[in-house]
Amino acid sequence: MDHPERFDVIVVGGGHAGTEAAMAAARIGARTLLLTHSIETVGQMSCNPAIGGIGKGHLVREIDALGGIMARAADRGGIQFRTLNSRKGPAVRATRAQADRQLYRQAIRRAVENQPRLALFQQSVDDLIVEGGRVTGVVTGMGLRFRAPAVVLTVGTFLGGRIHIGESNYGGGRAGDPAANALAARLRELPFQVDRLKTGTPPRLDGRTIDWARLTEQPGDDPAPVFSFLGRPDEHPAQVPCHIAHTRPETHDIIRGALDRSPMYSGTIEGVGPRYCPSIEDKVVRFADKGSHQIFLEPEGLDTHEVYPNGISTSLPFDVQYELVRSIPGLEQARIVRPGYAIEYDFFDPRGLHPTLETRHLEGLWFAGQINGTTGYEEAAAQGLLAGLNAALRVQGREPWYPRRDQAYLGVLVDDLITRGTREPYRMFTSRAEYRLMLREDNADLRLTPIGRDLGLVDDERWRRFNAKREALEREQARLAATLIRPGDLPDALARQVLGGPLRKEQRLEELLRRPDVGYADLMRLPGAGDPVPDAEVVEQLEIQARYAGYLERQHDEVARARRHEQLPLPEGLAYDRVAGLSSEVREKLAAHRPATVGQAARIPGVTPAAVSLLLVHLRRQGLLRESA
């Protein structure tokens, strides 16, 4: 039967991608339905209890700048906060929070349930309704049909999911949840290029059986940072430390002796695992010369004794897991409360997507999250926001939106996926962004909140707070640029103390702030400097923008040069076999990828600068060379 209600957007899956997709669609006015196999697991952290990290924290801040919910939930559920790379430049500094699983999930569910125009319904989805070459709805496991002109699939590891523990394996989307096998079979019938990936999780430990005195304590930062631009440190729950342990040669011997029982090495698992989060058996094999590997013992929450040993993800048999855990100093008496496992699942080649994350083969269908070959909560959530936004924009008859590589890490993520594809779970790093000095955590709001406001993603309170910060920043920048400090007004002793030496000539405060060892607080000690601004975020922006002004200017120039051709659109049906001078290899790659712009074409592996020049010549001759709006 058909459900009596009609929706604009249907989101399938209530994980990190699904919740952001549903929230984004509803925020801009679309009647949205979020379908999940269990309302109790909406917003669940299926793997490690943490948000953020290098590159990932940048995505969380961008989601927040666009009105998303991940950062707010992390602030309310975070039980340890740290700024990574704090001694390095601002481009690579990143926030990471250890989260209480229950508090985080509750924060997400609360946001979803209180969002206007967003309905929740508990049912798995077994089929898509396809009519006239486009998706028009879904069919649930009980045969109930929901209709909508836009459907977003955010199904995580559930498509054809198979869990492996040693020689045993069984169907599942994660431990305790069934796989979406019917939907996986249906998608395999459609014209998508499907493959398999693998990820894993470590055994969970009972913290009461760990000898904490033998481990190295790793405290959080004090004061603790926040993720959200609206967040405050006093919103954080109680803060707790993590601890560090180490494997030893005996641990590695146990693992090597059981490799023939590992599904990864016996050939049972065919999917490719994450390069940057390898299993412990992978680490022991790939880094055979290392006598020890770090393990981070992370608390799962404030009201549980369960501990997540980050660094020993494994699919080895339980008896081997038991032995290897107890070979680690400090864990000799540790009790395993949940076994580690690997999970293998379907994903679809993301080169079959538009930059909006709508599929090229079926109109009205968007993919977001692990279905596109990514790994990580943050990567999934960012894609979900973009997919849900564009699904709603389509229904409303509005122009699509997606960020460029120089605008956001989200732009880098999507461009990498749709241009280059992936053969292994894709993880975001700052090193993937060529314009990373412009794409910092601290300026995500300045980059994206005005865009989010125009799209309808940003509410009045966030917009008010953002404008207050932006106006304070602009006022103080103007004041620093206009305020002169003269040598005669500055005692030599104070000049040496603040500036490192006497002031030789008249200088503006703005110029003095560009000195590497001079901070804003130092400047405010100078006679005639005026009153300081109280907002720490404004001060941070003043220092970064002054200190890195020259580098930022050069990067802006690089962006301008690159954008001359970056946004030149390529006709969707362009016949690459008619472009004179292109090699067969380049023609095949362009035809397979179908890049939307010249910039995307240039980033396809194997497409040379010479090939791009030939492409531009062809477009010019055909009268197709026009600037994109």
From Swiss-Prot:
Positions with a binding annotation for FAD: 13-18
Entry GO MF terms: flavin adenine dinucleotide binding
UniProt record similarity statement: Belongs to the MnmG family.
Cofactors required: FAD
Main location: cytoplasm
Binding positions for NAD(+) per the UniProt entry: 273-287
Purpose: NAD-binding protein involved in the addition of a carboxymethylaminomethyl (cmnm) group at the wobble position (U34) of certain tRNAs, forming tRNA-cmnm(5)s(2)U34.
Keyword line: Cytoplasm, FAD, Flavoprotein, NAD, tRNA processing
Any GO BP annotation: tRNA methylation
Protein name: tRNA uridine 5-carboxymethylaminomethyl modification enzyme MnmG
Localization per Swiss-Prot or TrEMBL: Cytoplasm
Lineage, uppermost ranks: Bacteria, Pseudomonadati, Pseudomonadota, Gammaproteobacteria, Chromatiales
Subunit structure: Homodimer. Heterotetramer of two MnmE and two MnmG subunits.
One Pfam family in the UniProt entry: SAM_GIDA_C
